[in-house]
Curated annotation (Swiss-Prot):
Designated name of the protein: tRNA-specific 2-thiouridylase MnmA
One matching Pfam family: tRNA_Me_trans_M
Swiss-Prot/TrEMBL site (Interaction with tRNA) positions: H126, Q333
Region described as Interaction with tRNA: spans on this chain: 143-145
Disulfide bonds: C101-C193
Active-site positions on this chain: C101 (nucleophile), C193 (cysteine persulfide intermediate)
Keywords: ATP-binding, Cytoplasm, Disulfide bond, Nucleotide-binding, RNA-binding, Transferase, tRNA processing, tRNA-binding
Annotated function: Catalyzes the 2-thiolation of uridine at the wobble position (U34) of tRNA, leading to the formation of s(2)U34.
Residues annotated as binding ATP: A6, M7, S8, G9, G10, V11, D12, S13, L32, G125
Annotated GO CC locations: cytoplasm
Amino acid sequence: MRVLVAMSGGVDSSVAAARMVAAGHDVVGVHLALSSAPGTLRTGSRGCCSKEDAGDARRVADVLGIPFYVWDFADRFKEDVIDDFVESYARGETPNPCVRCNERIKFSALASRALALGFDALATGHYARLADGRLRRAVDHDKDQSYVLAVLTAEQLRHAVFPIGDTPKAQIREEAARLGLAVADKADSHDICFIPSGDTKAFLGARIGVRRGNVVDAAGTVLAEHDGVHGFTIGQRKGLGIPGPGPDGSPRYVTGIDAQTGTVHVGDVADLEVTSLQGDAPVFTSGVAPTGPLECVVQVRAHGGVADAVAELRGDTLEVSLRTPLRGVAPGQTLVLYRRDPAGDEVLASATIRATH
């Protein structure tokens, strides 16, 4: 099988490539250049996809004895990930750029090019598993990335390979060391790769500008003025610019954002609880939409907890009733449905949250 391996320059994708080679496949490595600006997309050990990372990936490819290329996806990345991120925050939403990158770059633009060039599959260093075409959580639950892959269609999954999903991270590092890969001890990336400083508010402010509005409490009392709803997210407690806690001394949190009026609503922690969710643009990983209610568990953050729920497709909307309330759920977040399974929870579907109740 001809396999293209997306090599970020980190230990995970490096071991993924090594395993594909060891399995006897015809392997080619590719690193995605995602920034057209001078320098890198990150500073220090933060982020990913820098020139240093490309060099690390090339050195791993040399050790493995496989061809290696750098492909420029900077324009596509800016349009489909960065611009989408900025526009979503301007609408008062809270997007996950890693979800968008997987959906629109790695498993769309990159995978399409790979197939057009005659490759049979695209392998990545994601912590997830595929069994009989079904996407499941990784063995290492702390590193599991099935959430950010849940937007993939059945056709995209058919051409995907996740070689390290059955192995804990510590063992991946040990394997890299045994193979003599210099990235064995390389630090993991955590930050948004296109925000080098880690200051999301400043990044957004530089692109959206000042759009003043008010911060109000449940009674409609104006507590403060702000420079734009992009500086807030549901559940936020710090940096609200308001004069202290509520009348009863309890902390106040962002409970709602109205981008049209520029109003940020604050309340107490109880106001953050939701019992139902509505999501649009649903994707069912099996390729078949359900005809009735689905018993499932729901996850709304990449490394968040889960809640038991019942989901039902009504038209183009995925409606979810939670058996246990969730807190701080924001429009724009990705909603992922799982089926509990001792062999590894199976991803059933994903959608973009549009409303909560």
